[in-house]
């Protein structure tokens, strides 16, 4: 039992030493503006989807980390043949970090990735 106490105490102290703002994940909306995008990568349209005539919009929730990169993305509205390409693109997007009380915070926002056949 004592072997667990020390690592647990260290973990608790480490967690408590992180500023509250750094632990907060804020959803964009209301008074919280979406972060400004500084890099956008278009998705690579899968050949299989092109041949099948599949097009549409994949909707995702993207978590933007305190450094401005996408740290998590979850598909909300799926188009199975296009989901992987949408996720691959979104994970390359970059944003200016969002500040809360002067400290960078993670934000969650809904993003769309359009696939249009030409």
Which ranges hold each PLM region?
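Charge-biased low-complexity segments
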Residues: 2-118
């Amino acid at each position: 039992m004592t072997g667990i106490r020390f690592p647990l105490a260290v973990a608790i102290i480490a967690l408590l030493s992180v500023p509250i703002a750094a632990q907060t994940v804020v959803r964009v909306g209301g008074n919280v503006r979406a972060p400004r995008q500084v890099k956008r990568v278009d998705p690579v349209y899968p050949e299989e989807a092109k041949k099948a005539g599949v097009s549409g919009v994949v909707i995702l929730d993207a978590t933007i980390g305190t450094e401005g990169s996408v740290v998590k993305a979850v598909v909300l509205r799926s188009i199975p043949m296009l989901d992987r390409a949408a996720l691959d693109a979104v994970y390359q997007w970059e944003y200016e970090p969002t500040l809360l009380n002067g400290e960078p915070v993670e934000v969650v926002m809904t993003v769309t990735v359009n696939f249009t056949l030409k």
